[in-house]
Amino acid sequence: MDIEFVRSRFIKHFDGKTGNIYFSPGRINLIGEHTDYNGGFVFPGAVDKGIMAEVRPNGTDTVMCYSIDLKDRVEFKVGDPEGPRATWARFIYGMVQEFKALGVDVKGFNIAFAGDVPLGAGMSSSAAMESCFGCALNDLFADNKVSKWDIALAGQATEHKYIGVNCGIMDQFASVFGKEGKLMRLDCRSREFEYFPFDPQGYKLVLVNSKVKHELAGSPYNDRRKSCENVVTALGKHFPDKKFETLRDANWEELEAVKAEVSAEDYQRAHFVLGEKDRVLAVCDALVAGDYETVGQKMYETHYGLSKEYEVSCEELDYLNDVAKENGVTGSRIMGGGFGGCTINLVKDDLYETFIENVTAKFNAKYGHKPEIYPVIISEGSHKVC
């Protein structure tokens, strides 16, 4: 993000005075998909694309907001019980309300912000906004005494209460806690986490956005969650002396023991979840050893599981995965909930240009539009820039 670009817009729209500048990143999730609601592990990292905001207290009880990208301006009172209608401004309003609930005496301020997180690419621009605004509020009104976890939770609460999205905690966590050159294994049950090195010399990490999103009949995500719950119920009945809260508590032998007691569909979905738990742990070990070939192998295994067992892929994503294999890409998989969106790819430097040319040309020839290409670097989390 260009600091001078944001600053020039802030000065133009707010009486010529400057404020403080803050940045919060989007995120990728290298591996660990559909594991959060099963009490498992996710493995995100912050990236070098995000949201930048300039903020300055204005001595009133009014928050004056300007979206540089949308060229839209909104104002609201700090104590307004309803808040603004514009969705983008409700992210700011929600964070103000959540900080007030934490006991922070938030006053009026001016804010202008812009982002370079590609929309629809699964890098969580919304969490980057919440984290950026939270970082600013913490610095300006709380003397940086609000914990990182509380900032992340305030972002999650903003989505739940003011945007109407029932998200998990991974996106906000990654944006707030990210570190340059580090991925984070987050235990979605205990919220304990650990940093792991990600410095793939000789490789690039790149997202390929299919730009398709399939709207399916029914509630495919809820259906898969219900499948997992069905298997947990069967496990509890079969093993009455053991407590099963989620599939996190099951091992392979226990899953096989209830195979005949659940539907084939529920079994294969649970099979994916147990396999994904093992793959996350294997990738952590591989990163410590600097073994990026194993990391890539596990990414391909996850894609296969998401496509054939969990059944959240689509023709376009499977095609991107196939083209990656044909071009010698070290690892490739669906990133995100599925049914469209991106693949995340680990590509050797000397194959990168050829892969990008081939995947762009082949996908365009087959589907009539070019995919979007986003190389990313694992970067620092939310911080004050200047």
Regions found by a protein language model. Give the residues of each.
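Glycine-rich phosphate-binding loop
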Residues: 339
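C-terminal nucleotide
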Residues: 1-27, 52-85, 182-331, 346-386
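Short Gly/aromatic-enriched secondary-structure transition segments
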Residues: 39-46, 224-225
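Short, charge-rich binding segments
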Residues: 44-46, 54-57, 103
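FabD-like malonyl-/acyl-CoA
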Residues: 128, 342-346
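Gly/Ser-rich oxyanion-binding loop with an adjacent helix/lid
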Residues: 1-22, 28-32, 37, 41, ...
